[in-house]
């Protein structure tokens, strides 16, 4: 029986490259030179942004987003927390999310059921397995999921006939 998996994954190496590109861009920007820094924590997949003022943090977030787009990483996976003061500096944390949580998985399954396609969707941990009798039905399910905007980027892998 044909099936595929709906997942949300990040290429960690590309994320690291994007953060390094953002650091280089920060050094090149005259208005931010020496006033801010990015600190990438690879294990937690977070970036700590430090600047003198909140408007500089906003500019740094925009630099990071542009670097992600250049590396073909969807910016929906970047979750920014509120800025906070730490001494004379402002700090903000940005976290890279991956994996489909239960709430999003339920939305995906509900969307597939609402589309009234001849497929079944089942939640399996951090992925959703979609099975059907025909390959065409699965391709319709992929098209239906791509047409709807979810708050996480979705990838389709493990397509089997």
From Swiss-Prot:
<dbReference type="Pfam" id="PF04461">
    <property type="entry name" value="DUF520"/>
</dbReference>
<dbReference type="GO" id="GO:0000166">
    <property type="term" value="F:nucleotide binding"/>
</dbReference>
<dbReference type="InterPro" id="IPR035570">
    <property type="entry name" value="UPF0234_N"/>
</dbReference>
<keyword id="KW-0547">Nucleotide-binding</keyword>
<comment type="function">
    <text>Nucleotide-binding protein.</text>
</comment>
<comment type="similarity">
    <text>Belongs to the YajQ family.</text>
</comment>
<protein>
    <recommendedName>
        <fullName>Nucleotide-binding protein PputW619_0959</fullName>
    </recommendedName>
</protein>
<dbReference type="InterPro" id="IPR036183">
    <property type="entry name" value="YajQ-like_sf"/>
</dbReference>
<dbReference type="InterPro" id="IPR035571">
    <property type="entry name" value="UPF0234-like_C"/>
</dbReference>
<dbReference type="GO" id="GO:0005829">
    <property type="term" value="C:cytosol"/>
</dbReference>
<dbReference type="InterPro" id="IPR007551">
    <property type="entry name" value="DUF520"/>
</dbReference>
